[in-house]
């Protein structure tokens, strides 16, 4: 909420379950419970962001009447975007408590993920088009045909990474990205 206020409502809250068993163990988290823990944390955050006084009772988190201030500038809360592949379990969570999905471009079965997300939305009576779909390319930028295909599939934004290079190397890459877009 504080970051949303400081940014004038420009915050997008990216979330994911995590994948590294060792890292989770080092942080005292049970890898097998990560999905349920994330779900409850997001539902809890929404309660605190949208109510003057909130309580929560879940399998992993419980608390009685509490409050949190400041409240987000964005109403009812900053957009919550789930990263990663969208198998049936992740798709169900995207449909339940997220505002969007942001897979890594070229790394997952995008079409299958889109179908899973649409099916999960339909199963709970949510319009799949209410989700903001973005694709993140961590290594460069896709070609113009791929970007067009994404747009035709309902993708609203493609994010192209720019490697940490000096201006003489980075600027030509940006020129190429611009041609693709």
Q: Which residue ranges define each predicted feature?
A:
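Active-site-adjacent structural elements that line small-molecule/cofactor binding pockets in enzymes
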Residues: 1-181
């Amino acid at each position: 909420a504080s970051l949303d206020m400081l940014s004038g409502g420009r915050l997008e809250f990216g979330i994911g379950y995590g994948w590294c068993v060792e890292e989770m163990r080092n942080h005292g988290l049970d890898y097998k419970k990560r999905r349920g823990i994330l779900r409850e944390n997001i539902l809890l955050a929404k309660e605190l962001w949208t109510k003057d006084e909130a309580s929560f009772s879940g399998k992993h988190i419980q608390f009685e009447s509490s409050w949190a201030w400041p409240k987000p500038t964005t109403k009812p809360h900053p957009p919550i975007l789930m990263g990663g592949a969208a198998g049936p379990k992740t798709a169900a969570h995207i449909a339940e408590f997220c505002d969007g999905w942001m897979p890594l471009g070229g790394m997952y079965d995008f079409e299958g993920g889109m179908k899973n997300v649409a099916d999960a939305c339909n199963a709970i009576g949510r319009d799949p088009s209410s989700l903001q779909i973005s694709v993140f390319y961590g290594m460069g930028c896709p070609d113009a045909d791929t970007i067009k295909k994404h747009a035709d599939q309902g993708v609203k934004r493609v994010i192209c990474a720019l490697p940490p290079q000096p201006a003489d190397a980075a600027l030509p890459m940006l020129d190429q990205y611009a041609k693709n877009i």
